[in-house]
Amino acid sequence: MTLTLYSMPSSGNSYKVRLLLAHLGRAYRHEGMEYGTEELARAHAEGTLPFGKLPVLVLEDGTPLPESNAILCFLAEGTDWLPADPVTRARVLGWMFWEQNQHEGTIAVRGALRTYAHRAHLATPERMVALLDQGHAHLERMESHLAGHDWLAGDGPTVADIALYAYTHTAGEKGGYDMDRFPAIRAWLDRMAALPGHVGLTDIP
């Protein structure tokens, strides 16, 4: 039995896992589902999604692993994507916690409000302005760090870079953020896309 990934092709959180699996060269079966589909309703009904959301990675023995960043850490264990050095690993995890606690709540949310029809009614002018301002502030934090470093943590790419790449690389197109303000981020995005094994958001196996 091989790995099975339940994922939403349009979602950055699901994309993180597909991207790392591609970099690791791991074979897996992909079960894609979007909002409003029968597949997603069935996954909920059958209890496939432990926390009620995607992605979920089901291991060879049938064990389900929810939460994108937890899955990244599991898959990356023992590789350079998750450094063994305790200090470097803590820095990696710090960026990943920040991604879920701060970055995703603005960058991803604003993109979702502009992208998914069933969320359009939540996109009030006041909320969209607030998300734009907060998102730019979060991008500025990344810009400040990347202006002096090629990668977010350590001397090479880690799962921290994958976690932040997923929603940052579509922040301009989906979220309407002004990425011209962030040359260091744009250079980092180019470095990520140039890595061997890279796959795009729409590259579904």
Language-model features, listed with the residues they occupy:
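GST-like domain detector, emphasizing the conserved glutathione-binding G-site
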Residues: 1-129
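Proline- and acidic/polar-enriched loop/turn elements at helix boundaries
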Residues: 32-33, 86, 158, 184, ...
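Residue-level recognition of oxygen-bearing side chains
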Residues: 70, 184, 197
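GST-like fold's C-terminal all-alpha helical module
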Residues: 96-193
